[in-house]
Amino acid sequence: MFNITISKILARQILDSRGYPTIEVETILSNDIKAKACVPSGASVGKFEAVELRDNDKNFYNGYGVTKAINLINSEVAPQIISMNTLNQEKIDNALIEIDGTDNKSRIGANSTLAISLAIAKAAALALNIPLYQYLGGITAKVLPTPLINVINGGMHADNNLDFQEFMIIPNGANKFEDAIRMSAEVFFQLKQILKHKKLNTNVGDEGGFAPNIRINTEVFEIIIDAVEKSGYKMYEDFSLGLDIAASTFYKDQKYKFADYELNTQELVEYYKKIISQYPIISIEDPIAEEDINGWKLITQELGNKIQIVGDDLFVTNCKLIQNGIDNNMANAVLIKPNQIGTLTETFNAIRLAQKNNYNVIISHRSGETEDTTISHIAVATNCGQIKTGSLSRSERLAKYNELLYIEKLLGISAIYYGSL
């Protein structure tokens, strides 16, 4: 049983939720067990993320093809991984890192290494006849994460005029994950009716949230709060608000350039302090640009004991950058995106480092997603307590929520809902 080895690795090109090519890898074991994994792709990408290998041939999928990566997997990487013990995830991932040979996966691509890494982990779980979350986390894996649900999209995730990228509802008052999803769906339904009544657009963005043309951010807060209350729930007690600012996308010449005005770092931090005092906002992601280091120190000093301050572009799931943030008191939470680093082992190392230093951890999807549900299992395996995987529309987002509902049923009375952040 424990000598089950990898007999085949097959890569192919598929499409993600935006219609862009991505990689699917199928692993076949020596006992004929098969498992597949697909990798996502981001729109707002941190400067220090591991490299996603693309063809850059404008005559083929406008340059977004991944045939180079697939050919590398099938012809070069697979022969070096075949015959390895399926259950030795760390050894396999280290081999992938060594085969690539660069600091940022630029030779074979983090999209290549991650697809292989995830497919092998899935196959190993099947070989042991246990759920993936249990294979990754053991018998202590039982915490269902609080979802940070993106109900209004803006920024680079939608064709509207909102500066901020995500406006999220957080069902912190639910008793179990199933209730959290039901409550959030009821708010989402109500939100659509309110937007229609205001004659605002109810088309959805990349992550399934509505994408209305609203000029003022605080108007979005008011609309979401109205939806929560009309659904019969209370702010703070049942729901809170979260934001993903994606500040790096509008930071230029040491200024934060919004559509109608610009602010320096101090003024932006003061703006955050103001809205936090006026609205039930408990989490802000990427409130400061990744290169504005003094700004990160300032906002953590000013607000770090009041709300969750999440680093995404600042950390990009990289242990060195997370350690630098810890050492310099920047942020108090880390967003984890496996495709930012490229292997399951490195992803878990980043999670453990954050948890060891009392930083909150949020497992996250990307704006260009697939039906793969591995991040749902990673969230439960690590007991991290939070997940971001979009809104309550678009099946590539709902697949993750539905998988968590299934995991909650598998865990039965052992399941614990994380709840308040």
UniProtKB/Swiss-Prot annotation:
Main location group: cytoplasm
One Pfam match: Enolase_N
Domain of life the protein comes from: Bacteria
Pathway: Carbohydrate degradation; glycolysis; pyruvate from D-glyceraldehyde 3-phosphate: step 4/5
Enzyme class per UniProt: lyase
UniProt GO cellular component terms: cell surface; extracellular region; phosphopyruvate hydratase complex
Cofactor(s) required, per the database record: Mg(2+)
Chain positions recorded as (2R)-2-phosphoglycerate binding sites: 165, 337, 366-367, 388
Active-site positions on this chain: 207 (proton donor), 337 (proton acceptor)
Binding site for Mg(2+): 244, 285, 312
Keyword vocabulary terms for this entry: Cytoplasm, Glycolysis, Lyase, Magnesium, Metal-binding, Secreted
Record protein name field: Enolase
Naturally occurring in which organism (per UniProt): Ehrlichia chaffeensis (strain ATCC CRL-10679 / Arkansas)
Lineage: Bacteria, Pseudomonadati, Pseudomonadota, Alphaproteobacteria, Rickettsiales
